[in-house]
Amino acid sequence: MTLLTRRALASIVLLAIAGFAQPVRLTPQPQKSRTFYALADPQVPPSLREPPAALPIGDTTAMASASDGAIWYGTAQGLVRVDGKADPRDRCQYFAGHRYLPDDGVQQLVPDLSSGMWVRTRTGVSHIELRSMTLEDKTEIFENRIRQRHDRHGLVAPSNLVTAGDPATNQTRDDDNDGLWTSMYAAAECFRYAVTKSPEALARARRSTEAVLFLEEVAGKRGFPARSYIGKGEPLPRDGQWHWTPDGRYYWKGDTSSDEIVGHLFLYGVAADLLPDQALKKRIAETTTRIVDHILDHGYYLIDVTGKPTTWGRWSQDYFRQNPPDSPLNSLELLSFLKTAAHITGNQRYEKEYRNVAIELGYAQIATRYLDIRGEINYSDEELAMLAFYGLFRYEKDEDRLNRFYRPALDAWWANIVREHSPLWMCIYATGEPRAKLNFDTAARTLYRMPIDTIDWTVKNSHRQDVVFDQEVDRFEHRQAKTLLPRDELPVAKWNSNPFVVDGGNDGRSEDDGAAFLLPYWMGRYHKFLLGK
């Protein structure tokens, strides 16, 4: 009996005894912010300028009790807050690196009157505040940041900071996965509109959905989306395969990955279902038709302008005969493309091809083999799988097919994903396994602990005594932990990153867009896994 078969049987037993997913009622929670000051700044408490008092032990350099009763400890390697009354997951919190401190050498602490702390270090002062806010309040911070610094022709992606750590020096740039990141942001805005009916959400959803649609149009409207593009006069990129449009107005990037097709089709299904604009829905259906026809007409390959398949756009039986470890994922992707296209367009060609691919060609069975042939854990593949699962579980109504193939396949991926406490993957898992016993308090806790500051500061945790390391490195040879640290103590990351790599960052030379927070929040609100604001 294979491991996957055992997982499937265990899942059946679990579902027989489990209740439904447990939604969580959201409440305002303290969110961290910090402001740096020079020691001589008049806003700094005068007592912080006094010589620090010596403590009887060497490891602790300062100690203070905050107005809420929490005890803060300064050390030569950062700051620790201990609150015995807090949820066990939040009882001990670590502050280090430029996300929180001018440097990690804490010398003196002075509490403010609102549960926060003034912190003097070797090189400056940080005022760390704990501001009570709802998750919806938090979304507004991310939304404003995206509008101000991460919108390039409607595409949403990370940006560079010319001066490290200074958002005023922000420069948007093209990204290999502009289509995927923008699709995830646009989908978040679609869910936001469905929940709130906000005109602003509708406008943002339209703008970014149109930007994703244009990626296919700029490359010639032949069903081959560009990875990214720039306009004439913008700085020319130095990497990848780029092509000018015939009119010389745009320069677009080729060698498009399966990542982009997954992202586009995920968005198109969500937008077609949730947005009211009939003209936009027509464009979505036409673009979906061209993309899926391109894949079908080229034998399940994505064919570049070179006439050859792209590096990762391969879903054919010939490719699968080589027994690549990504065949379960790629099978899942193609099935999701076809099912989503059938739903969006109503074209029976795609439904007929879907059934042929699923059963006659055996792709549904191949999709269940993930644990049998997985060579390594690839967190980018997890992202692609879960986005593909969303379309399948949303549009597939055949319970036999769901129970025989797709739910066992989902459980195989979930075996590792469950460790990550990702609210996005929890939402998608719950749509596929509605009887599974999931507590969305875990999802909410991750959202609460995602940092508001998305600058890619250098973060180091490998020295910590509370981190237990795995003996195996990850696929990039990075040391990884068994301990899952809170997101606001980790390097800034998207959902395709390994959350068990505890060191990282680039000294504040870039800023993430923050859409990784918006999509699970609004998806959770839409599906009523997250109740309230």
What do the PLM-derived regions correspond to, one by one?
Residues 83-88, 131:
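Short loop/turn segments that connect beta-strands within beta-propeller blades
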Residues 183-198, 248, 263-280, 330-347, ...:
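Well-ordered alpha-helical scaffold segments within catalytic/enzyme domains
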Residues 137-167, 204-221, 286-305, 349-370, ...:
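Long, well-ordered core segments of solenoidal/helical folds
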Residues 76-80, 123-126:
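Loop/turn residues immediately N-terminal
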Residues 152-166, 175, 202-326:
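Extended ligand-binding groove/face enriched in aromatic
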Residues 70-73, 116-119:
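Conserved beta-propeller blade signature
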Residues 130-149, 385-533:
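Terminal, non-catalytic domain-edge segments
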Residues 23-67, 93-113:
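Short coil-to-beta transitions that initiate beta-strands within beta-rich domains
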